[in-house]
Amino acid sequence: MASPSLLQSSASSFHGRFSPLAAPSSARMLSPPLRNVVKVSASGTVLVEKSEAEKTQRLKTAYLERIIPALKEEFKYVNIHQVPKVQKIVVNCGIGDAAQNDKGLEAAMKDIALITGQKPIKTRARASIATFKIREDQPLGIAVTLRGDVMYSFLDRLINLALPRTRDFQGVSPSSFDGNGNYSIGVKDQGVFPEIRFDAVGKTRGMDVCISTTAKSDQEGQKLLALMGMPFREGGGGSTGAIVRKKKLKSHHFDAKGKGKR
């Protein structure tokens, strides 16, 4: 058996030969900061490259770089804050059987959330109307208000994807302004949006889209939307000549006897 003095000498030689490991500092444990990355909260959203995020807002970029100078030149604005812009977009969908059909209401909310990228709220009756069998606080539909980047993204998809996919589309009416530069448009089928699958649509529903702008007149509001790409059709009492699409003429079919039929 080894003596205590021998054990003490061997232990001292062992510790002298191998120096203890230094504890890593907190600065070494942290990873280097990410550059050109959009930071998001930990809500299940994946980090996105900044360059890719900027590409998705092409309509907002076009407004800042191209549309503002064009409007300043045409309407002779002195201050840049006088240039009209889209302030908000309200999307609402009326559901007649919302009180009796909870599944239909939830399906409509899911569709609107997919289309707009924002969860809608339920709209309820403010007063009871016996003629229409409506009680106070009864759910009548859903609505969502869009602002900022979500608003520009929805407007871009509405103009360039949804409206051209509408059956027999001949342009939107230029006479749907309210006199203060705000524009309203109706979409008959939510299936024109690419986010909605045709096989998953249980019932065809329409929606109303109200575009609120800071324009002082319908002429300024129509020019703003026309520069953004809104396909206004010819005629309809519009206040400007911003026409993108022309109305198609009806074709005549002739039978064997040469008589024209419409």
Swiss-Prot record:
Transit peptide: 1-39
Location relative to the cell: Plastid, Chloroplast
Transmembrane helix listed as a keyword: no
Pfam families the record matches: Ribosomal_L5, Ribosomal_L5_C
GO MF, any single term: structural constituent of ribosome
InterPro entries in UniProt: Ribosomal_uL5 (IPR002132), Ribosomal_uL5_bac-type (IPR020930), Ribosomal_uL5_C (IPR031309), Ribosomal_uL5_CS (IPR020929), Ribosomal_uL5_dom_sf (IPR022803), Ribosomal_uL5_N (IPR031310)
GO biological process: translation
Keywords: Chloroplast, Plastid, Ribonucleoprotein, Ribosomal protein, RNA-binding, rRNA-binding, Transit peptide
Main subcellular localisation: plastid
Keyword NAD: no
One Gene Ontology CC term in the entry: ribonucleoprotein complex
PROSITE patterns named among the record's database cross-references: RIBOSOMAL_L5
Domain of life according to the entry: Eukaryota
Assembly and binders: Part of the 50S ribosomal subunit; contacts the 5S rRNA.
Function: Binds 5S rRNA, forms part of the central protuberance of the 50S subunit.
Family designation: Belongs to the universal ribosomal protein uL5 family.
HAMAP family per the UniProt record, alphabetical: Ribosomal_uL5_B
PANTHER family cross-referenced by the UniProt entry: 60S RIBOSOMAL PROTEIN L11-RELATED (PTHR11994)
The protein, known as: Large ribosomal subunit protein uL5c
Organism of provenance: Arabidopsis thaliana (Mouse-ear cress)
